[in-house]
From Swiss-Prot:
A Pfam family assignment: DLH
Domain of life: Bacteria
GO molecular function per UniProt: hydrolase activity
Protein's organism: Escherichia coli (strain K12)
UniProt-recorded name of the protein: Putative hydrolase fragment YghX
Region of interest (Disordered), residue spans: 91-117
Length: 117
């Protein structure tokens, strides 16, 4: 897969909705937490792996826009994993409570994120 093909997977397009279900047998998806690198609490992330991995597997960090780890970004991570990559989608809103379930509220929360954390 080329970098250009990966960029096509990452373009936001809410009209497409869910393309790869959480329960797809070709992937293993889970929510994880890990410590903030600067010691400011935990970061929530969505980790998705191909169900059948052997040896070293390339990985992609799926970075959301200003709305948080919304369902579209989760679907992008699942598509990346289905293409054979490990995908990690961290929630950049973790320090302010995480994705609120609404894109407009997510944009508002993005303004409250302390960039030094």
């Amino acid at each position: 897969m080329t970098a250009l093909a990966l960029f096509d997977l990452l373009k936001p397009n809410y009209a497409l909705a869910t393309q790869v279900e959480f329960t797809d047998p070709e992937i293993v998806a889970e929510y994880i937490t890990y410590p903030s690198p600067n010691g400011h609490g935990e970061v929530r992330g969505y980790l998705v792996k191909p169900a059948k991995m052997s040896g070293k597997t390339p990985a992609v960090v799926v970075v959301h826009e200003n709305r948080g780890l919304n369902p579209y970004i989760e679907d992008v991570a699942r598509r990346v994993a289905k293409a054979g990559y490990i995908a990690l989608a961290p929630d950049g809103l973790s320090s302010v409570g995480g994705y609120p379930g609404n894109d407009d509220k997510g944009r508002e929360l993005q303004q409250q994120v302390d960039p030094t954390n």
